[in-house]
Design a protein with these regions (language model features):
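Subset of outer-membrane beta-barrel
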Residues: 1-182
């Protein structure tokens, strides 16, 4: 997922509720326009702090299409924020994810029909969990997260070719500069 800068909660559950107000986000991205099977990403998320508590919650949905594959992911996030100083807050978050991966073999042109490598590849469901930490103020933010702790095999155990989604660590940071006093 390359659009994390626009929707940090997708990769870091500690971001949920960190803005202090309800936030709704939507994104559509199409690459290689006009090319059949070109990558397309759609994402929508909502997150909010829970009033009179240190908790934040979020829900996100991501749909990605690449060639003959479609992947739908829905995630629920919860975060807990601690005021560490007058300026900084530190948030911890956990994420629960449900993922549905589908390969449409009718969009492929195999050399021979009945290839065993192309069997049992549709509607592969996989759950996952993740966690993150997010330090933020009005000017500075730093974060670290692992959105998916479990390695996910995309094809059945009998296949020779297996695609695995491995655990990734994400680090994010930034500072807001004032360009002028006006």
């Amino acid at each position: 997922y390359t659009q994390y800068m626009y929707n940090t909660m997708v990769i870091n559950p500690a971001y949920a509720g960190s803005r202090g107000v309800m936030s709704i986000f939507g994104l559509h991205r199409t690459q290689w326009v006009g090319l059949d099977g070109a990558p397309t990403t759609n994402a929508i998320s909502i997150n909010t702090p829970i009033e009179n508590s240190n908790l934040g919650v979020g829900l996100s949905f991501v749909n990605e299409k690449v060639g003959p594959t479609v992947e739908n992911t829905i995630s629920a996030d919860i975060s807990y924020t601690i005021q560490t100083s007058e300026t900084y807050k530190l948030s911890f978050g956990v994420k629960g994810t449900a993922n549905l991966f589908n390969l449409d073999v009718t969009k492929l042109n195999p050399v021979s029909t009945g290839d065993p490598l192309l069997q049992n590849l549709d509607n592969n469901f996989s759950p996952n969990v993740g966690a993150g930490v997010y330090l933020h103020s009005n000017k500075l933010y730093l974060g670290a997260s692992v959105p998916n702790f479990f390695e996910t095999k995309r094809y059945d155990d009998n296949s020779i070719a297996v695609y695995k989604e491995r655990m990734n660590m994400y680090f994010i940071g930034g500072y807001v500069f004032d360009l002028s006093s006006n």
